[in-house]
Amino acid sequence: YPWFGKDIRQGIELALENYALLHRLWREEFVDWSGRFRTPLQGFQSTPRPLDGVAPFVWHGSIRSPEIAEQAAYYGDGFFHNNIFWPISHTKQMVELYRRRYEHYGHGSADQAIVGLGGQFFARANSQDAVNEFRPYFDNAPVYGHGPSLEDFSAQTPLTVGSPQQIIDRYMTMREHVGDYQRQLFLIDHAGLPRKTVLEQIEILGTEIVPVLRRELDALRPAHVPDAPTHAARVAARDAALAAADEPAYDDAYRFGTGDNWTGLTAEGGQRAQEQSLARDRRNQARLADSPA
């Protein structure tokens, strides 16, 4: 924070204000804005515009700040709980808060909220081999060492050291505490592991752990619980909404000619843009007039 002239003690306020502005910049062509932490904007257009005119799906990450869970719920965005150093009881509390508020803001039922979790593991074919190999790294790593034992830390956090099946079994239980969730991230290059070992762990994850977790968790997920949104799905939803509202289809063509070297406008291009803007205003006014008081 100090590198950018900010006070880390205002981290939450910065996160809330900055994202509120970013959310508007992605969705509005021209923005007038003022806030606490940066200079005001007047008629500002951010470029480049979002791909296909659709803002990316955003995950809000938090360890222990309920304000970030609230922020994710307010916008209907995803909530990622960075839980790798926390007991499952804390993770459950944070995710439940997000789910309740997601439903409160009208984005869907609580179990349809988009959730991600962290995790970490070390695996070998034989569980005792995994423990024996990982323990020296754990005991001497600054982030772990000289604190709880490997066994105590593993009991209190998602860290799982053992066979691939033990890791699968441990992470299958996460659903029992937080409900169906859409993303599971794993920390692999931790505790000072050498590159060769990290690559071996990635291989085990991709071939022996993830395929089983994906298959088993997908089979348990009810039909009404969605996957995490993809860009293609968000574009399709936007297009369907435009069609349902009898609005013109999205056009990503550059709307201005390039005749004027200063403004990039030609008279024809500027007039066309003005006509499009007026047409949008008329449609908005008509919808307001048709809305119940």
Describe the predicted segments one by one:
Residues Y1-A293:
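Active-site-adjacent structural elements that line small-molecule/cofactor binding pockets in enzymes
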